[in-house]
């Protein structure tokens, strides 16, 4: 578990270094380096996960079953559907409360460039849903989950929140990370968090684009509230199934292991968060 934590932590340190490098370049080169900054740790993490798998097989003396983290059956889709609206509502509420608290100290989120809707959806919803979920959910699922589901959930959420390097995003990113990974672990697939991440970010983009008026905001929030109510009713009707599903997302493995690399990551992200104020 400790070596696995060290590896995942170092992958995120590598990401921070590469993102910092990409920030020095503008235009298409800066954009390209931004995506390369995610691709490099993802590729390294994938190959390292195969190394850890071989080591576990050597110790156990038996071959492990191939993972099905990219599988997404119709049954899993039906289970995920009622979880979408409540998840978006939880993340939205956490984001709103964080913004209100930080506004007391004069801290606000950086404005998002107002471009056409399709461009904003690709840049702020689709790309993050794929790149961030592969790095912060898929890689921990492959490397950490075989040792501890609780540790996998905690660390993936911690890294996901730290890497935003923003005090205004850290709390709700951690909450989103916990919820996303819990659902991924429970369903045994990375697709739920990719879908949830995209829908959550797309909802924020639509709200920013068309929710400037009180009427627009009211309509969007009203639709979300109605979907949450319907979803909660569906979950309550199948509370035994969902209860067993969520309990299966936890185990008695190690939930926290300290490594110097983690301290280095916290210090790097903290420094960048302060400089971004």
Regions found by a protein language model. Give the residues of each.
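Alpha-helical membrane-inserting segments
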Residues: 18-26, 44-52, 89-102, 183-187, ...
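Membrane-helix interface and helix-disruption motif detector
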Residues: 1-3, 24-34, 174, 209-220, ...
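Juxtamembrane helix-loop-helix connectors linking adjacent transmembrane helices
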Residues: 22-32, 61-134, 138-146, 273-277
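Transmembrane alpha-helical insertion/packing segments
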Residues: 1-30, 126, 135, 207-209
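Alpha-helical transmembrane segments in multi-pass membrane proteins
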Residues: 10-56, 218-226
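Membrane-water interface of transmembrane alpha-helices
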Residues: 43-60, 229-243
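Transmembrane helix-loop-helix hairpins at the membrane interface
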Residues: 120-274
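Interfacial transmembrane-helix boundary/kink motif in multi-pass membrane proteins
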Residues: 2-13, 35, 57-94, 245-267
């Amino acid at each position: 578990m400790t070596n696995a934590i060290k590896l995942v932590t170092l992958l995120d340190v590598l990401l921070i270094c590469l993102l910092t490098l990409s920030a020095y370049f503008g235009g298409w080169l800066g954009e390209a380096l931004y995506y390369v900054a995610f691709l490099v740790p993802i590729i390294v993490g994938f190959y390292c996960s195969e190394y850890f798998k071989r080591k576990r097989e050597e110790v156990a003396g038996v071959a492990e079953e191939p993972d099905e983290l990219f599988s997404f059956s119709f049954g899993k889709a039906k289970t995920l559907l009622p979880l979408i609206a409540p998840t978006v509502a939880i993340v939205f509420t956490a984001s709103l409360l964080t913004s209100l608290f930080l506004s007391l100290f004069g801290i606000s989120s950086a404005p998002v460039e107002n471009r056409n809707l399709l461009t904003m959806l690709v840049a702020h919803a689709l790309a993050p849903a794929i790149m961030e979920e592969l790095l912060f959910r898929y890689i921990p699922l492959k490397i950490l989950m075989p040792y501890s589901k609780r540790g996998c959930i905690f660390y993936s959420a911690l890294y996901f929140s730290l890497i935003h390097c923003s005090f205004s995003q850290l709390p709700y990113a951690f909450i989103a990370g916990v919820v996303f990974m819990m659902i991924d672990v429970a369903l045994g697939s990375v697709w739920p968090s990719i879908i949830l991440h995209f829908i959550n970010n797309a909802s924020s983009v639509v709200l920013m684009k068309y929710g400037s008026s009180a009427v627009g905001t009211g309509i969007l929030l009203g639709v979300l509230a109605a979907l949450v109510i319907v979803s909660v009713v569906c979950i309550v009707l199948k509370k035994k199934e969902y209860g067993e599903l969520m309990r299966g997302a936890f185990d008695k493995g190690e939930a926290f292991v300290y490594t110097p690399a983690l301290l280095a990551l916290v210090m790097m992200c903290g420094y960048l968060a302060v400089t971004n104020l």
